[in-house]
Amino acid sequence: MNALYIIDLIGFFGPHILFLITLYLLYSRKHYLFVYIFACVLNGIINLILKGIIRQKRPDGDTDIFNKNKKYERIGSNNFGMPSGHSQYVVFSTIYIYLVLNNTNITLFYALVSLITMFQRIKYQNHFLKQVIVGALLGGSLAYCSYLFANKKIMGKLVSKKDDNALDTI
């Protein structure tokens, strides 16, 4: 296997890679994890609904990543490419993990996988550039809204209490 093919595979499986890593990273932050999983499902539903409404075709090439001499066979709603689900998922995961963890190294890794994924979708003619950009914008927007929701729910549970001076009675 050559290095370029491995990069292509990273791009193809980018959403899955980031999803699994995010589950691991958010395991100790259950509330953020729950919101992330729920928002991932919502992200997929939004993607399918928009593809059904917009009905914009994919490029004609649409190469199969596992056999470059063959055109990828698509059925049903998978024939439509607007917005790109891959870019929607990877940017969603990248923005969400950045907002929750605020860790530069993790964010850079996520951004790299996201860029590889978006490039791979265009390289293999699975999507037009516009479809990838719209998917990324949708994913980023949903990540931001999900983070605001999760953060509000967590902060809403913090209630300041008057000190009961329990230690003074001992």
Regions found by a protein language model. Give the residues of each.
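Hydrophobic alpha-helical bundle signature of multipass membrane enzymes
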Residues: 1-82, 88-123
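A cytosolic-side transmembrane-helix exit/cap motif
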Residues: 52-63, 127-135, 152-160
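Alpha-helical transmembrane segments that form the membrane-embedded catalytic/substrate-binding core
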Residues: 86-90, 127-151
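C-terminal membrane module of polytopic membrane proteins
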Residues: 141-170
